[in-house]
Regions:
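Short, solvent-exposed, Trp/other aromatic-anchored flexible loops in extracytoplasmic proteins
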Residues: 110-149
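Short coil/turn motif common to extracellular beta-sandwich-like domains
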Residues: 68-78
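N-terminal prepro-regions of secreted/extracellular proteins
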Residues: 1-70
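A short, structured loop/turn motif at beta-sheet edges
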Residues: 67, 101, 132-136
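Short beta-strand elements
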Residues: 152-167
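Low-complexity repeat regions of mature extracellularly deployed or surface/particle-associated proteins
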Residues: 59-63, 75-77, 141-144
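Extended low-complexity, serine/threonine- and proline-enriched intrinsically disordered segments
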Residues: 78-110
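Tryptophan-centered short beta-strand motifs
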Residues: 30-32, 41, 105-115, 155-158
């Protein structure tokens, strides 16, 4: 799946915003901090029915059995209006970024795309990254969502961006 120019621009803005918000203090362990608990509310109408949702992104780290740090990024879609958002009308993406212990900017490590739980029809995206060489000092994730307004496959612009960090 390719990102639209609008998503790419919004993702770049999210990188800059998160870079300015994330404290770079060194710590012995990782802990999760939600900078924004939910993305902005979005609504749309399909075939005369109104739907609304927000997205929530989070990043967490665990230690693998080999002692490596593994970062997990998730972005979930939450229905706001009491109707299930049609799964064919929404795409969700999660992007996991990392910053080197040597400094510099955040770098995109991994991207996860829309997954639909077949039992609950919950819409989410997930991805992970294992720090093989103990080089990453902090991580953050950005969640993106797009909606389709009609039966045509032209997707609207980016809806919500939400950032969580870990350092």
């Amino acid at each position: 799946m390719k990102m639209t120019k609008r998503i790419a621009a919004m993702a770049a803005c999210a990188v800059m915003a998160a870079s300015s918000m994330v404290g770079m203090s060194a710590s012995a362990g990782f802990s999760s901090t939600m900078l924004e608990p939910n993305g902005s509310y979005e609504s749309f109408t399909v075939d005369g029915v109104n739907y609304g949702f927000q997205i929530r992104s989070e990043v967490e780290t665990t230690t693998t059995s080999s002692g490596k740090t593994k970062a997990n990024s998730q972005t979930y879609l939450h229905e706001v209006v009491q109707r299930k958002v049609p799964t064919s009308n929404v795409k969700v993406q999660t992007q996991l970024y990392g910053k080197s212990k040597k400094g510099g900017n955040y770098t995109l490590l991994s991207v996860g795309y829309t997954t639909i739980d077949s039992n609950t029809t919950r819409i989410y995206a997930t991805t992970s990254w294992i720090d093989q060489y103990d080089e990453i000092s902090s991580y953050y994730t950005t969640g993106l969502a797009e909606k389709r307004l009609s039966s045509y496959y032209s997707w609207s612009n980016l809806l919500s961006v939400n950032t969580s960090s870990i350092s």
